[in-house]
């Protein structure tokens, strides 16, 4: 069992693997090197079994499960924007919950790692030895709508899996009324035209989640979009009322 924590990762195992009631004990701990900035906010696993972790300052780390080696890369834009954004959000809000990256990531079967920064969603490709940001390897970065300036609060979700299916990655964007937003995971179809109101041609669909009430002016979600087939569902985390 692996858990991500603020400054690293922790491995746990059963005292007696043959006993289903055996207690868990910590067996190893990995601390991030000083050059990897920020706090960890996400953890997942690539198809080869390596852990992948993300920090709020835009670092992505691939970590061997025995903690013997790691590979790190910065997301596009992190070197110029992440530290300032994190400092500004902490000053404005009094906490570090609205970092340049503030959600976890999802991984597909080909090594694609999908993660959102404050105004872009990225596909970074794990080759088995390194992270690639190269379009030739299938990597991309695409902007999404971000009227609040706080970015997406949803960990990306995959939609479409069959060899002949359209394949998307789905987020809730950063507008005041959150839009469920689909990106083409793979190559954008040649005849695809950029949608009205979409800041990127990679966006395959978007629509506001009004929750059945078109008069609502603020709807936010902090959960991953729930996907079933090509259907998607979200919740509203805006409180129905506030104390005086």
Name what the model sees in each region:
Residues 1, 33-48, 82-107, 150-158, ...:
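Repeated scaffold domains used in trafficking and secretory/extracellular systems
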Residues 1-5, 48-55, 61, 111-116, ...:
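Short beta-strand elements that form the blades of beta-propeller/WD-repeat-like
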Residues 2-13, 25-64, 72-73, 99-106, ...:
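Mobile, glycine-rich extracellular loop/lid and propeptide segments
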Residues 5-17, 57-66, 118-127, 176-185, ...:
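Structural motif
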Residues 8, 16-19, 45-51, 58, ...:
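Elongated scaffolding segments in large macromolecular assemblies
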Residues 22-35, 69-96, 138-146, 204-215:
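A short beta-strand motif characteristic of beta-propeller blades
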Residues 49, 57, 67, 79, ...:
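Intrinsic-disorder/low-complexity loop/linker signature
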Residues 105-216:
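Long, internal scaffold/assembly segments composed of regular secondary structure
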